[in-house]
């Protein structure tokens, strides 16, 4: 039976790499897929990974009906044995509903990839809807690490290396350009303390010490 599968995780856990691997494995067996993406770091109409791999994709626009787009593709003689939706957290809730309809009405597997929460630890609407509708939610097993070495569970937005907790939910940044808007994965402890790798280096911090209560 076709499924809607949501592969989730923090940044740096290999979501886009897995999406590209699924595309490679299926195309090697003669299957053809439709790849949707939104706001990829490599630019419009691209699916890329941090390992440098990249392929062409369909850039999703605001208000675009993904089900109708796929039906139009098929009606014009196109083929789609599966659908990949990368950066799915940026999709609107109704677009996630449309992907579910692709599975149910067209009998086509849909593989969605995305991060679950934003830099404030709030669910992205697209990710929330995927959790609600997906036949399976797979948490990727490649663990991203916080600067302290602990498992990273939260995504932080930084400006000049300083963590910020206010601003628009979606701002495309770069993990390699610390002087602009960037992103970093942190463990919960250091996300709560707003302690990025840059701020930790600047303060030359020793291991965390619990506060001493005087009484």
Regions found by a protein language model. Give the residues of each.
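Walker B catalytic acidic pair
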Residues: 86-88
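Catalytic P-loop NTPase motifs of RecA-like helicase/translocase cores
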Residues: 90-92, 119-120
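Short recognition patches in nucleic-acid-associated and regulatory proteins
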Residues: 142-175
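Short basic (Lys/Arg) and small-residue
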Residues: 134
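Sensor-1/coupling segment of RecA-like P-loop NTPase cores
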Residues: 103-126
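Conserved P-loop
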Residues: 1-74, 118-129, 142, 170-173, ...
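Residue-level preference for the first positions of well-ordered beta-strands
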Residues: 4-6, 32-34, 81-84, 109-111
